Design a protein with these regions (language model features):
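C-terminal intrinsically disordered, low-complexity extensions immediately downstream
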Residues: 1-79
Length: 79
């Protein structure tokens, strides 16, 4: 998974908001629907947010510090 600066910003955004939705990312990051949707799906794969729940926002499963630990683990695994 590619964790670029926009993805990092998206993860911080959903953790601060306490919920994750494509519309939140579209508004805050000024990205299109498709990109926002892919970001949410990638966050689910990384364990940052929970599964799709119909029209409700997804649950956020970690704090920012937990995310930093997970990111370091993912980056070390990629090396």
């Amino acid at each position: 998974l590619d964790i670029d600066s926009k993805m990092e910003e998206a993860i911080k955004c959903v953790i601060e908001a306490g919920q994750a939705s494509t519309s939140l990312l579209q508004r805050r990051l000024k990205v299109g629907y498709a990109r926002a949707g892919r970001m949410i799906d990638d966050m689910e794969q990384m364990g940052v947010v929970g599964p799709h729940q119909g029209s409700k926002p997804r649950d956020v499963l970690m704090t920012y510090n937990e995310w930093l630990e997970r990111r370091n683990a993912l980056e070390n695994r990629a090396d």
